[in-house]
Amino acid sequence: MPSFDTVCEANLVEVKNAVENSAKEIGTRFDFKGTSAAIEIKDKEITLFGDAEFQLQQVEDILRNKLTKRNVDVRFLDKGDVQKIGGDKVKQVIKVRNGIESELAKKIQKLVKESKIKVQAAIQEEKVRVTGAKRDDLQAVMALIRKDITDVPLSFDNFRD
């Protein structure tokens, strides 16, 4: 039976490269000289540092620019709150989404069931597997998911015939 998986995975190598390029640009930019503006990545968390919130915004803009140049969708970024750290400095943690959250997986499953297309959607850990009798039905479901769910960058892989 034909099937495919719906996943939400960022290319972490490209994300890491974008963060390193952002750090390099922050180090050379004139408006960041003598400030504590910095960016670092650990696992799937990017941490922005700055002297004020506007500086965090500038660092985030640099990061978004570098991610876009490397063809990484910025919707993978899940911004946290701005936190004050020692003195006048602030930081912000941005998590890189990897995997579909359970609420979104249930929403996708419900969407597929309500479409009346003859396919089954099963939630498997951090992905949703869609199985059907015909390849055309699966392609219709892909189009439906792309059309209805736009706030999260979903991709389809493991297409089996």
Swiss-Prot record:
GO terms for cellular component: cytosol. It comes from the Bacteria. Keywords: Nucleotide-binding. It holds the Pfam family DUF520. GO terms for molecular function: nucleotide binding. InterPro entries: DUF520, UPF0234-like_C, UPF0234_N, YajQ-like_sf. Belongs to the YajQ family. PANTHER family: UPF0234 PROTEIN YAJQ (PTHR30476:SF0). Nucleotide-binding protein. This is Nucleotide-binding protein Aave_1854.
